[in-house]
């Protein structure tokens, strides 16, 4: 519980020990750290939050994927299905799906039939590329590619019931546009572009 965690941290501080509260991934995502920081401040205990590597970054590596492909998506939505922790109505899966951006969905592996339904109702085509990444960056990591409509059956066939991320979007397909960043006609701070668009910038 929060109280038990705080008891250990406060006790360590009183004993002048170096206390590390270790989280998986990056604590800024679904880490419940705000309440811990508030209680530390109440006790006048200083702290430092160190960044980690979120599983959604690990999943991109496992997929050899770029979440922001030119001409496909320049945005990434990180969200979850409502469970024991509610999700505000304005942040529904359907409302995010309407943007057709890349979506990375946490904490929803046990609700994949409902997730597929909501993604499709929101605007994704049933055939939209998707992936289930189980235990990203772990030794027993597993990557299962599928379509949005097949999320539930794919998870069942591979024995995945928890500890997985769902990635959805056309960035998992094969189409994209060449980036401007490395285009010969594109000017940056370090390189003058060649051609009529040489003065262009992102």
Q: Model-derived features: where do they sit?
A:
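Class I S-adenosyl-L-methionine
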Residues: 1-50
């Amino acid at each position: 519980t929060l109280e038990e965690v705080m008891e250990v941290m406060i006790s360590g501080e009183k004993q002048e020990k170096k206390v590390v509260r270790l989280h998986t991934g990056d604590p800024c995502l679904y880490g419940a750290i705000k309440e811990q920081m508030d209680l530390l401040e109440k006790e006048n205990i200083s702290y430092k939050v160190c960044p980690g590597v979120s599983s959604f970054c690990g999943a991109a590596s496992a997929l050899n994927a770029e979440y922001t492909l030119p001409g496909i998506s320049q945005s990434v939505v990180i969200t979850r299905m409502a469970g024991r922790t509610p999700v505000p109505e304005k942040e529904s899966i359907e409302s995010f799906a309407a943007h057709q951006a890349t979506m990375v969905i946490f904490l929803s592996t046990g609700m994949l039939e409902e997730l597929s339904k909501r993604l499709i109702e929101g605007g994704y085509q049933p055939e939209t590329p998707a992936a289930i990444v189980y235990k990203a960056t772990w030794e027993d990591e597993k990557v299962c590619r599928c379509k949005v409509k097949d999320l539930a059956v794919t998870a069942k066939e591979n024995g995945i019931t928890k500890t997985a991320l769902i990635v959805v979007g056309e960035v998992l397909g094969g189409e994209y546009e060449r980036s401007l960043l490395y285009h010969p006609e594109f000017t940056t701070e370090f390189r003058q572009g060649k051609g009529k668009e040489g003065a262009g910038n992102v």
